[in-house]
């Protein structure tokens, strides 16, 4: 078994650094063109002609891409492609599947690093640091750690014991059918992980990205294809509304949903899946992460300056648009009296827009 992976190192992007210069050049390149983003179904690019624009959130007049939206026909084709691809994908075996995503991690940490970071900065208005820890480091870690632990399914997680005269065996199989991955706008890493984690263990997926992060998500889709992902294993279907989602949820081969988003949306998915059970070949697995609240607890002997920085960054980095953002603080009265003026002053210096 390969050695336990290390976390991907975080680059600083300090002034004068090589990575900063490379990132700036890639941002300039991406801003100089308008990309046509297709659906990707069974490895083929489908330009539907039904388009929406993807703009820079902090500069609405700048168009990054024209997105060709999936309709009912494309969603049905994506579901069928996923079903038809599964047998060969299973036959490939875990080790070869792991190798594809480990190669994707290697590409993301090297030649695709600037591409992923630049697209996330432009598409989701993240800083270089926020993009680096998300689009690169976290997704690299997902792919490497997922592969590492997937290899341990048999030997480590469920060891077998066979008494004399008895032969016990375990066969770990993927779900029969496709997984619908519905991904969020705020983390490129989660968007890449939701379809690829089930794919690693032999499932196939239909990936419906958030309308607000299609540009960066398409970069990740292209990266996985360059790493050797076979056609049909993950099908990329940007679209809108409940109409195309319902087509997947009501497909007899729908086997599961992998979701990150709002609690209300997830509740709605449960209800719609329940109403479609009579049409499904099996009981689908429903896995979801919804909105959370984070907090800061300060010790009476804490470093006051460090606390102020933690409160500012925890609450306001990426505009607080993440479940790990701090929305509550528990601070001893003695500490609060000494930091409140500085904290209020620093909050007043925060500006909105392109820095």
Located regions from the model:
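A structured beta-alpha segment of the ubiquitous adenosine-cofactor-binding alpha/beta core
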Residues: 168-170, 235-258
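Hydrophobic/aromatic ligand-binding patch that stacks against planar heteroaromatic rings
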Residues: 197-199, 248, 278
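Conserved small-residue-rich beta-alpha loop and adjacent elements
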Residues: 155-231
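Hydrophobic face of amphipathic alpha-helices that form TPR/SEL1-like repeat modules
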Residues: 1-64
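C-terminal segments
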Residues: 1-25, 129-156, 169-172, 260-267, ...
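Glycine-rich loop-to-alpha-helix module at the N-terminal edge of alpha/beta enzyme cores
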Residues: 49, 53-55, 61-154
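ALDH superfamily catalytic-core signature
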Residues: 223-228, 250-252, 256, 263-355
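Residue-level signal for inorganic ion chemistry
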Residues: 61, 97, 202, 234, ...
């Amino acid at each position: 078994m390969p050695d336990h992976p290390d976390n991907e190192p975080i680059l600083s992007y300090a002034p004068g650094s090589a990575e900063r210069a490379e990132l700036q050049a890639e941002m300039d390149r991406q801003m100089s063109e308008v990309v046509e983003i297709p659906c990707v179904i069974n490895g083929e690019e489908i330009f539907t002609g039904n388009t929406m624009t993807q703009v820079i959130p902090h500069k609405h007049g700048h168009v990054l891409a024209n997105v060709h939206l999936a309709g009912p026909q494309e969603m049905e084709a994506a579901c069928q492609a996923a079903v038809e691809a599964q047998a060969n994908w299973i036959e490939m075996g875990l080790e070869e599947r792991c190798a594809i995503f480990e190669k994707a991690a290697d590409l993301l940490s090297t030649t695709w690093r600037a591409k992923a970071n630049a697209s996330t900065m432009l598409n989701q208005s993240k800083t270089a640091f926020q993009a680096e820890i998300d689009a690169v480091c976290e997704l690299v870690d997902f792919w490497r750690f997922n592969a590492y632990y997937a290899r341990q399914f048999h030997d480590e997680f469920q060891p077998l014991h066979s008494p004399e005269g008895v032969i016990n065996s375990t066969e770990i199989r993927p779900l029969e059918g496709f997984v619908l991955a519905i991904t969020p706008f705020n983390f490129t890493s989660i968007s890449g992980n939701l379809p690829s984690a089930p794919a690693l263990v032999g499932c196939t997926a239909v990936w419906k990205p958030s309308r607000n992060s299609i540009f960066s998500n398409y970069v990740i889709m292209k990266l996985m294809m360059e790493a050797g992902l076979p056609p049909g294993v993950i099908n990329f279907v940007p679209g809108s509304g409940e109409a195309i989602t319902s087509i997947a949820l009501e497909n007899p081969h729908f086997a599961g949903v992998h979701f990150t988003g709002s609690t209300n949306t997830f509740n709605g998915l449960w209800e719609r899946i329940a109403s479609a059970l009579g049409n499904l070949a099996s009981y689908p697995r429903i896995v979801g992460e919804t909105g959370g609240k984070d907090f800061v607890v300060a010790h009476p002997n804490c470093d006051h300056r460090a606390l102020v920085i933690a409160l500012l960054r925890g609450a306001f980095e990426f505009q607080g648009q993440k479940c790990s953002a701090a929305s509550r603080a528990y601070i001893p009265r003695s500490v609060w009296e000494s930091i409140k003026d500085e904290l209020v002053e620093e909050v007043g210096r925060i500006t909105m827009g392109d820095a």
